[in-house]
């Protein structure tokens, strides 16, 4: 017989309350919170760890700080002895999650899915303990379903329920087609939770519909329903859009420490509190104190942002790299001097070359149009002198230093 909270010992009750507060802190929504508490009571009273699921569509494997909001929450469960279920949607990934899309997505090949899944797992090791992760591929069970199984699965949900998705409604309103196979994505994601018997599923707020499918199908298959924890979406460097590589407003966890530090320092002040709470591993009381100091003016926003930048770099590259990145930032931006470790390139090309062509050939910028925009915006300097003419020619000379933006430097030899 399952024990109630009141039947636990005082120390067990204290542990339930501690974990409950930990997991709910920073979450956008817990559905429903009373069931989360009940699951913790059962786990702590029986010594049975909970199974925490995170589903991944391996279509964009570069992990940035936006992804780590959910990963950091997952790590909290892992550190308290619960089982992390990383579900690679190698089967569903070939369909593509239509969430937030105004058109159907290109299907991935098996090779693309496997490569992206491997890349994901390697990067997640910077946040999670990979030795304590259960890695699952949903093709293991979805490939075994026959037509009768699929029809049975489809019969456990209505078309009206599937049409509640905002993106489907928008596409119908815009007279854009919806392929039948797209309806199966949330069905299969929900069925994953049935197979894994997950106790809790994590996701961003944009995954609200999909993760609730797990609860729906677990109930229809007479399983205990999972609790859903939705985490906030992290805005990118522009302070407006959700962090995304396609929006060019992201901080990648594999980026060079100097770039990571510099990008963090470019954040709008209005985002600092959110980043402190969602993107750092500081203790809860440290986070609260730092935010309080910001609000009262006890700490200057610049100093708080430097602490934020140093913390983020330290999390993914270590303390020494964080200190070096801070030193480099101070040297370049606060003392207006050049960094000490400017990479050098042995130039064997023309002695005179169009500035735009030079920037692209050196891979400082990815295209001529991007190089043109950077020059127009005053972001290119040669030996400290700003380049203002998009048609300018560069006269190549030894030890010439090219600066692009605030953080890219290159010396020609």
Swiss-Prot record:
ATP binds at residue 245. It catalyses: tRNA(Tyr) + L-tyrosine + ATP = L-tyrosyl-tRNA(Tyr) + AMP + diphosphate + H(+). The keyword Nucleus does not apply. One of its GO terms (molecular function) is RNA binding. Homodimer. It comes from the Bacteria. It is found in: Cytoplasm. Residues 353-413 form the S4 RNA-binding domain. It comes from Bacillus subtilis (strain 168). InterPro entries: aa-tRNA-synth_I_CS, aa-tRNA-synth_Ic, Rossmann-like_a/b/a_fold, S4_RNA-bd, S4_RNA-bd_sf, SYY-like_C, Tyr-tRNA-ligase, Tyr-tRNA-ligase_bac-type. Its EC number is 6.1.1.1. Disulfide bonds: none annotated. Catalyzes the attachment of tyrosine to tRNA(Tyr) in a two-step reaction: tyrosine is first activated by ATP to form Tyr-AMP and then transferred to the acceptor end of tRNA(Tyr). A motif ('KMSKS' region) lies at residues 242-246. Keywords: Aminoacyl-tRNA synthetase, ATP-binding, Cytoplasm, Ligase, Nucleotide-binding, Protein biosynthesis, Repeat, RNA-binding. Residues 89-101 are annotated as: 2 X 6 AA tandem repeats. A motif ('HIGH' region) lies at residues 58-67. GO terms for biological process: tRNA aminoacylation; tyrosyl-tRNA aminoacylation. This is Tyrosine--tRNA ligase 2. Gene3D superfamilies: HUPs (3.40.50.620), RNA-binding S4 domain (3.10.290.10), Tyrosyl-Transfer RNA Synthetase (1.10.240.10). Belongs to the class-I aminoacyl-tRNA synthetase family. TyrS type 2 subfamily. GO terms for cellular component: cytosol. Sequence repeats lie at residues 89-94, 96-101.
